[in-house]
From Swiss-Prot:
PANTHER family: GTPASE ERA, GTPASE ERA, MITOCHONDRIAL. It is a peripheral membrane protein. It comes from Borrelia turicatae (strain 91E135). InterPro entries: AAA+_ATPase, G_ERA_dom, GTP-bd, GTPase_Era-like, KH_dom-like_a/b, KH_dom_type_2, KH_sf_prok-type, P-loop_NTPase. One of its GO terms (molecular function) is ATP hydrolysis activity. It comes from the Bacteria. The gene is era. Residues 36-40 are annotated as: G2. One of its GO terms (biological process) is ribosomal small subunit assembly. Residues 200-276 form the KH type-2 domain. Residues 119-122 are annotated as: G4. An essential GTPase that binds both GDP and GTP, with rapid nucleotide exchange. Plays a role in 16S rRNA processing and 30S ribosomal subunit biogenesis and possibly also in cell cycle regulation and energy metabolism. GTP binds at residues 10-17, 57-61, 119-122. This is GTPase Era.
Length: 290
């Protein structure tokens, strides 16, 4: 039996979280077209008769010098150090740039085995030729490259096969039925944050986080009270919406997902609260992403 830890890295919006969810066959990580949706190192677990793979989904790699983004990049680097294999995900629509050079340099210095995963092959207009030339120039062997569509689940089984080829014999780190090690509080807050980001599109994704005040199982029914925290007063109105319609829609969708995932009915109560300039508070940022 084989087992091991695998980090998933790549630029923002390359489909890392979609890949994780597709392999593990559960919604573990937030999926959004908005860059930098993933903040924490999210673990997904896949177990079959061959063994167990523990995936670590990481924030999108970029070179921004903003305080919040530097903290996110710390998560990327620490995830790489924890793993036996790296999945480097490239969006087939993106022409290789500075980030690709930087990521391959980091991978090379780590001395860790890696696979290059070219994602979104179901899309018509691509930069496949440029990507393949770039990888060839970097000395990446074709055996280390796999082309997939995480969203359409094309070549997902092939990825699993390739991963197991690169892992050593080892124990099961988690019980077979586990597909994530996230605590209920974190999973719940990530669901609410994901729904909020989806509804707001590009307006506020970096300026909000979710604070769970109460999460209780009351007679096989979840009771949840949560706050959507924003950094600026004007952002409250954007989330609440006209006549409270915005926050009501967020609550309804989040409640449905929470009920489906935890297989229990759910009472969810949401409020929007201001915590001025929270995204410039180093201590709070550290707590949120670790």
């Amino acid at each position: 039996m084989k087992s091991g830890f695998v980090s998933i890295i790549g630029r923002p919006s390359t489909g890392k979280s979609t890949l994780l969810n597709s392999i593990c066959e559960h919604q573990i990580s937030i999926i959004s077209s908005i860059p930098q949706t993933t903040r924490n190192k999210i673990k997904g677990i896949f177990t079959d008769k061959r063994g167990q793979i523990i995936f670590i989904d990481t924030p999108g790699f970029h070179l921004s010098k903003k305080q919040f983004n530097i903290a996110l990049m710390h998560n990327v680097h620490s995830a790489i150090k924890e793993t036996e294999l790296i999945l480097y995900v490239i969006d087939i629509q993106d022409k290789p740039g500075i980030e690709e050079n930087e990521i391959l340099t980091i991978i090379s210095k780590s001395k860790i085995n890696f696979l290059v995963v070219i994602n979104k092959i179901d899309i018509q207009k691509t930069k496949e030729r440029e990507i393949m030339i770039f990888l060839e120039e970097k000395g990446i062997k074709k055996d280390n490259i796999i082309k997939i569509s995480a969203e359409q689940k094309i070549n997902i089984e092939e990825i699993k096969d390739k991963i197991y080829e690169n892992l050593q014999e080892g124990p099961l780190y988690y019980p077979e039925e586990y597909y994530t090690d996230q605590e209920m509080n974190l999973r719940t807050s990530e669901i609410i944050r994901g729904v909020t980001i989806k509804k707001l599109k590009e307006e506020l994704p970096y300026s909000l986080y979710i604070e769970i005040e109460i999460l209780e199982d009351r007679k096989n029914k979840l009771f949840i009270k949560a706050n959507i925290i924003v950094a600026v007063e004007s952002q409250k109105g954007i989330i609440v919406g006209k006549g409270g319609k915005g926050i009501k829609t967020i609550g309804e969708e989040a409640r449905k997902i929470i009920s489906e995932i935890f297989e229990k009915k759910c009472d969810l109560f949401l409020q929007v609260k201001l915590r001025k300039n929270w995204n410039k508070n180093p201590k709070l940022i550290k707590n949120l992403i670790n």
